[in-house]
């Protein structure tokens, strides 16, 4: 978005400030897209003989898709069957990529994170038409899934939770994650 683009109509602004985000399906694609975005800004400035200042900060890493955890899936099935309505439990397509991102993706690059999505809403999360249309599914079933998942993972001395941790292959160590994120903190200025 252009956050500053001049103060007067019909006058070429002396300063234009653009803020943008780069998102991608994996960390390598993020680095590639960020380099291309910076190159595009430099090229645009060069084309019109302008100075270009680029300040880069890291954003969220993408969420990592994984097969449904059997304990969470079982919890979802139990919770959906114990409700007033009959809700269908569907495994998420692990090949699909969402353009949205949160800090969950960052945590998943370091340690295992079990996530699930429930319904009970209409429209996109940040849209003007967003609304909760099924309180039972949005709140009650979701809370039951959380509680049952925790119980199933932690019973028998946390046997299933320990399996999740033991079988997880992290993308980064904590130190490597910090180094990767710090590598995006840059500032450059090009004068013509």
Regions inferred by a protein language model and the residue ranges of each:
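Zn-dependent metallopeptidase/amidohydrolase metal-coordination segment
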Residues: 74-76, 82-144, 148-149, 153-191
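Midchain, well-structured core segments that form catalytic/ion-binding scaffolds
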Residues: 1-79, 95-105
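Basic/polar N-terminal segments that are highly enriched at the extreme N-terminus
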Residues: 7, 191-192
